Structures are given as C-alpha cells and as structure tokens.
A protein has these predicted regions:
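Glycine-enriched, solvent-exposed interface loops adjoining structured elements
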Residues: 1-76, 138-294
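Autoprocessing Asn-cyclization modules and mimics
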Residues: 52-142
Length: 294
C-alpha cells in the first residue's frame, strides 16, 4: 500500500475543541461550547508566554535611532499623516485638540512618522504641530499600538553603524536607574526593557546621530483565535500540547473530576514540546596541551 505523501495535517479551532471535549468525556453540542473553549484557548496562550521561549514567535525588528532620543517602542509604532516632509526628526509633535505629544524618530515615507510612545492619546483627524519646524499636518488614523503591545520580551539586540553590528548588553531596572548621566551621548551599548503594557526600550548612551539602527529579536504573543474556522498560530510539534492543555482548561469548568489526569497529561506534553523547541548550536571541545615536567 502507498503512503499518502502529504504532510499538511492541520486542525482548525472547531476540531481542537471537539477533541478537547472528547478528552473530557463530553460532546461538543452548542455554540456556547465553542465560545467558552475559544476563550480558554486564548488564556492558554498567555500561560505559554509565561512558561518561556516559543521559538516560532521570535521576530527581528529594526528601528532607526534619532539623535537625543533614548526611549523607543518595543516594536513598530507609526503615525499616518497628511504629509511628513516638512517635519524634523527629533522634534516633538503636539495634537491640536488632544494635547498629546510624541517625538519623531524617523520618517519612513512622505505620509508617515515613526514615533516614541505618546504622552496622552492622539485623536484621528486632529492637527499636529512640530515644536521646532512649526510645520502642521493632519493625523489620518488613530495610532495603532497592537504591534508594540504584542511584544512579550526582547531577547537580544545590536546597534548597526556603517554596516557593522555592535552587540549591546541588557541591564536590569536598577542598573539602568543607577546610570548617573542618562543624557550622555554616544554609540549605545546597553539597553533596558521597561515591560509596561506598551513596553519601552530604553537605551544608553543616548544616540548621537540619526543613522544608527537598533535591531532586536523580540518574543511576541501567539496570534489570537477569533472564529471556529481559524487555524492556530503554532507549529505541528505543539498540536498534542495544545489539545491536552485545552482539555485541561475545559475540565475546570465542565468536568472537574477529570482535572488531575488531564493536568498531568498537559504538563507532560508541554515539557516534551518545550524540550524540543530550543536553540541548537555546535559544541566544540579542544584539548589542553599544557603539562607539568618533573
């Protein structure tokens, strides 16, 4: 008999839910069953983010630095405006009706700004005024924070100058606080991740030009499941783990007697998946030729 030749087995949300209910000793019957299971699955993904590194959710992000600005969003944060050409990188823009403020870190196009985390909330349609250039424009759409807020953590970072990458070291909150002169300028060599709801990348020394680029590998949230026909943002290695975890979460609400067994299966599947989802690198061992002579 011939094998199938296919390697594309994939479940959608409804099929995961059906399997999870069966593991709980029940049948999927109502629309509410799907809704409560969808909620449980999204909560399960939050648990995975707390458990450690999910390799498939790592993204590399690049941000062009601006002279004199040391705080940046941990992701892509832009404003779509009527025109950006008359504004200056590094200046502060202020909303005419909201009084919200942010600094321009770069101008990716003639109708966009890359900005720092705003103070206040800009309003779509309001007039923006530059502090130095006195230029004005209109904000076309509300600022979207979803990309920045999807960042769970930053794993590593470099600063690129003249096509050369220079590693920058991560420091703790207390170490960053202890820096006596945070305004000192130079090529950045340290960073601190301020893990707010909208996380901030704080770098030091403060950038000395508008051409250096910080590149960082960030761990991001797993994509939500929103409808029964959605496929799930995980590699196939995690299919058993997701099914076991969803069954365990559903059992808390529908069949508590099954919880101990389902939790045990989930933890076993989770450990197996996490052991596999890791970096691999070559290990080289060199013998030492030192010796003692009597």
């Amino acid at each position: 008999m011939a094998t199938s030749g296919s390697r594309n087995f994939e479940l959608d949300l409804a099929e995961y839910v059906e399997e999870a209910f069966e593991r709980c000793g029940m049948e999927l019957r109502t629309g509410y069953d799907v809704r409560t299971a969808k909620r449980s699955m999204n909560l399960l993904f939050a648990d995975w983010a707390n458990r450690g590194l999910n390799q498939w959710t790592i993204e590399q992000t690049s941000i062009t630095l601006a002279e004199g600005i040391r705080d940046y969003p941990c992701g892509t944060l832009t404003m779509t405006v009527g025109a950006s050409t008359s504004f200056t990188v590094g200046e502060t823009i202020t909303g005419g009706s909201s009084s919200a403020t942010a600094q321009i870190t770069s101008k990716p196009s003639s109708t966009t700004f890359a900005i720092t985390i705003p103070s206040g909330t800009f309003t779509s349609g309001e007039t923006l005024t530059g502090s130095g250039s006195a230029a004005t424009t209109t904000l076309s759409v509300a600022v979207d924070f979803s990309d920045v807020r999807s960042t769970v953590d930053i794993l590593s970072a470099v600063v690129t100058r003249s096509s050369t990458d220079f590693e920058i070291q991560r420091v703790s909150r207390s170490s960053y606080l202890d820096i006596p002169n945070k305004s000192q300028s130079g090529r950045p060599n340290e960073f601190f991740v301020d893990r707010q709801i909208t996380p901030i990348l704080r770098i030091w020394p403060t950038p000395e030009n508008n051409t250096d680029v910080v590149k960082f590998d960030r761990l991001t949230r797993i994509e939500d499941v929103d409808s029964a026909t959605d496929t799930v943002d995980i590699p196939f290695r995690f299919y058993p783990c997701l099914t076991a975890g969803l069954a365990y979460y559903i059992s808390m609400k529908r069949n508590p007697q099954m919880m101990p067994m389902l939790k045990s299966v989930y933890e076993e599947e989770m450990q197996r998946a996490m052991d596999e989802d890791r970096d691999r690198a070559s290990l080289r061992i060199s013998p030492s030729y030192d010796y003692y002579r009597d």
